[in-house]
Amino acid sequence: MGKYEDTLEDIKQTFGIVPGFMKAIPKDVLMQDWPLMKKYQLGESKIPAKYREFIGLAISANIKCPYCSLMHTAMAVGNGATQDEMAEVAFLASYTARWSAMLHALQYNYDTFTKEVHQISEHAKKTARK
């Protein structure tokens, strides 16, 4: 088999199917992206799988991508996410966008904000639970 066929076989072994959207992209793109997706989205990494899916779900909510939301929700549940956790992710996703909108609407000075964030971060380091 050639590299493309090997990639398709690896996808099938991983997902049980080769999704049509993966066949629809250019072959060279799939051959390049699949190993990265498999390693960082599906494999062992420094971030546990469920948390990676939470990150993906929060991002997909903010970019309003129904495809991404569906995939990351299903994968989060498949990795043991509870309804309470999913609800918290939904809140956090909306909260980040909300505060971003407020800061932009206020036209809050970015240099001031940067200094304040550093102060907050230093305080968090000192008071973090060990």
Regions from the language model: what does each represent?
Residues 1-51, 104-130:
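Acidic, glycine/proline-rich low-complexity segments that act as flexible tails and inter-domain linkers
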Residues 38, 56, 73-77, 90:
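Amphipathic alpha-helical segments within well-ordered protein domains
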Residues 55, 59-71:
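Short, thiol/selenol-centered motifs that function as redox-active sites or metal-ligating centers
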Residues 30-31, 71-85:
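Iron-sulfur (Fe-S) cluster-binding segments and ferredoxin-like electron-carrier domains
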Residues 85-91:
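Beta-strand segments within the central parallel beta-sheet cores of soluble alpha/beta enzyme folds
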Residues 91-109:
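Short Fe-S-cluster ligation motifs
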Residues 64-68, 101-103, 111:
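Short helix-capping/linker segments at secondary-structure and domain boundaries
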